[in-house]
Amino acid sequence: MITTAKTLLWLDDYRNPEKNDWLVFSPIGRDVNIIWVKSYNEFISYIINNSLPNGICFDHDLGEEKTGYDCAKWLVDYCMDNNLELPLYAIQSANPVGKENIDKLLTNFINKYELS
């Protein structure tokens, strides 16, 4: 029997998802194919070129002008434009305000568009 691991898109400019048990944040478990992207542009490029992953882990502060919140906004627009459900997600950011903003954005999208 052939099984294919699920894909986790790990957005973080600093934390290596394969070290220090960061995969505890994975919304789809630990048996995953990890794609580590470190910037807004890498995040968008991966999704456009490969489609949506099974799960996404968001960091907020990416060490550049664009943040994880900007990635989440782009993702919501992409899902709306393409009539897609949001992948399962988690937020591993140490920035409590950024974490809350990402979570509110994605939760509002799920409640307003996916449940209607």
Residue positions per predicted region:
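Catalytic phosphate/metal-binding cores of nucleic-acid and nucleotide-processing enzymes, i.e., regions
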Residues: 1-116
